[in-house]
């Protein structure tokens, strides 16, 4: 049972066992589960049924031990336990923000013996009527966006689909978000509906479209109605603009799309989002106009971080409106979230409101995203795995900046 933590920006070690040495079946798709069963001698004629049983227990019921699988024969349960586990990534640190946001630092199993395990972060953002889980797709990031903390951490590797799905399993474990489990209680958690994790956003560490195969496979697992059952309209993939993969994502997978735009001129976006040098704004916008999954009912979200004196003028707002012509879009204005060492500042609220008003009067929804989890470095642009630890001085600086931004 999950014992809810009191809201605090202080990190605490989570009471989770060390990583299993047996390969885990948690996070695998049906094909890989079938191969795992074949490897321990399950006859081919039984495999489809057994895969369906495993799928039900792992993804619908949240089983963490094969002994829980009461409709699976005792002999097979024993075989499974001898060769496999249902282990999740190790929770190294769990933090709870004053606003109820939760962040988990997760340690992944080493890919090869003797290799140093890598770490990623996942963030749960609760609201009254929903709970959004922000998942990572890479260890580190290669894009080096000027305002993003994750971009200061070098890219190590892509995550596997199983490692992406496992982030969702960890969150649901900790929140008691399975049928028959005692749900977590605490400040900010959803009070409506029967699920605590209702939406998934690929907005954590990494560029999802540079880990396309893993992300696509993970989405199919997450959306499967016999398991986790998170429909694709509740799954959003955010990209900084890997243009060749955008059409492919819409055609093959079909999730909601978000674009990390942040500038309306190539010269500025080249600085803020360096991938723009390879795929400039005109190419990016054309990919958005032809995105197969887009419609008035499934609008593309354009994320725009508000940087004081950089991209926040009325002229920028009008240029943004012009840029979005012909695209079913909404604009998400994001107050810049501070992190130690950054040279940028957040636009003041009057400037943000003027910018939002110009966009809104042009017919586009332009909500200003409420900063969540700033005090635990869980807000947009602040994620960076603790393998690259902040110094005490940097943490004090962060808290001062977060307090000043309130």
UniProtKB/Swiss-Prot annotation:
Radical SAM core domain sequence ranges: 127-377
EC number, as in UniProt: 2.1.1.192
PROSITE patterns hit by this protein: RADICAL_SAM
Gene3D superfamilies per the UniProt record, alphabetical: 1.10.150.530, Aldolase class I
Name of this protein: Dual-specificity RNA methyltransferase RlmN
Catalytic residues as annotated in Swiss-Prot or TrEMBL: 121 (proton acceptor), 380 (s-methylcysteine intermediate)
Originating organism: Azorhizobium caulinodans (strain ATCC 43989 / DSM 5975 / JCM 20966 / LMG 6465 / NBRC 14845 / NCIMB 13405 / ORS 571)
Residues the record lists as binding S-adenosyl-L-methionine: 206-207, 238, 260-262, 337
HAMAP family according to UniProt: RNA_methyltr_RlmN
Described function: Specifically methylates position 2 of adenine 2503 in 23S rRNA and position 2 of adenine 37 in tRNAs. m2A2503 modification seems to play a crucial role in the proofreading step occurring at the peptidyl transferase center and thus would serve to optimize ribosomal fidelity.
């Amino acid at each position: 049972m999950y014992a809810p933590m009191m809201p605090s920006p202080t990190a605490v070690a989570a009471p989770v066992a060390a990583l299993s040495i047996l390969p885990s079946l948690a996070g695998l798709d049906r094909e890989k589960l079938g191969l795992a069963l074949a490897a321990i001698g399950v006859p081919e004629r039984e495999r489809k049924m057994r895969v369906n049983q495993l799928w039900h227990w792992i993804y619908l019921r949240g089983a963490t031990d094969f002994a829980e699988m009461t409709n699976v024969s005792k002999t097979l349960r024993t075989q499974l336990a001898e060769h496999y586990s249902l282990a999740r990534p190790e929770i190294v640190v769990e933090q709870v923000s004053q606003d109820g946001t939760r962040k988990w630092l997760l340690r992944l199993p080493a890919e090869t013996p003797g290799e140093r395990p890598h770490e990623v972060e996942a963030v749960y953002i609760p609201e009254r009527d929903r709970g959004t889980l922000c998942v990572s797709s890479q260890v580190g990031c290669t894009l080096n966006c000027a305002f993003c903390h994750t971009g200061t951490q070098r890219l190590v590797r892509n995550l596997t689909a199983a490692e992406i799905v496992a982030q969702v399993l960890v969150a649901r474990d900790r929140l008691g978000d399975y049928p028959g489990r005692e749900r977590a209680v605490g400040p900010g958690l959803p009070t409506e509906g029967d699920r605590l994790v209702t939406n998934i956003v690929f907005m954590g560490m990494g560029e999802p479209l540079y880990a396309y195969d893993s992300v696509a496979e993970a989405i199919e697992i997450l959306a499967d109605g016999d398991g986790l059952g998170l429909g694709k309209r509740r799954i959003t993939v955010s990209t900084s603009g890997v243009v060749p993969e955008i059409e492919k994502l819409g055609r093959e997978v079909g999730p909601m799309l978000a674009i990390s735009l942040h500038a309306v001129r190539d010269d500025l976006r080249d600085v803020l989002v360096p991938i723009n040098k390879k795929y400039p704004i005109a190419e990016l916008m054309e990919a958005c106009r032809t995105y197969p999954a887009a419609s008035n009912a499934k609008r593309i979200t354009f994320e725009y971080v508000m940087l004081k004196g950089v991209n926040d003028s009325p002229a920028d707002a009008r240029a943004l409106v012009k840029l979005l012509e012909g695209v079913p879009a909404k604009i998400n204005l994001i107050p810049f979230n501070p992190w130690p060492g950054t040279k940028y500042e957040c636009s003041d609220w009057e400037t943000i409101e003027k910018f939002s008003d110009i966009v809104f009067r042009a017919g586009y929804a332009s909500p200003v995203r409420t900063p969540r989890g700033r005090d635990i470095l869980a807000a947009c642009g602040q994620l960076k795995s603790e393998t690259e630890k902040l110094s005490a001085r940097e943490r004090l600086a962060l808290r001062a900046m977060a307090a000043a931004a309130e």
